[in-house]
Amino acid sequence: AVSLVLPQLK
């Protein structure tokens, strides 16, 4: 789940 959010912020 977290892996999906971090790339979106980048």
UniProtKB/Swiss-Prot annotation:
A single GO molecular function term of this UniProt record: glyceraldehyde-3-phosphate dehydrogenase (NADP+) (phosphorylating) activity
Record carries keyword NADP: yes
Record flagged with keyword Plastid: no
Enzyme class at the top of the EC tree: oxidoreductase
Reactions catalysed according to its record: D-glyceraldehyde 3-phosphate + phosphate + NADP(+) = (2R)-3-phospho-glyceroyl phosphate + NADPH + H(+)
Keywords assigned: NADP, Oxidoreductase
Enzyme Commission number(s) of this protein: 1.2.1.13
Source species, domain of life: Eukaryota
Family: Belongs to the glyceraldehyde-3-phosphate dehydrogenase family.
Subunit structure as annotated in this protein's UniProt entry: Tetramer of either four A chains (GAPDH 2) or two A and two B chains (GAPDH 1).
Protein name: Glyceraldehyde-3-phosphate dehydrogenase B
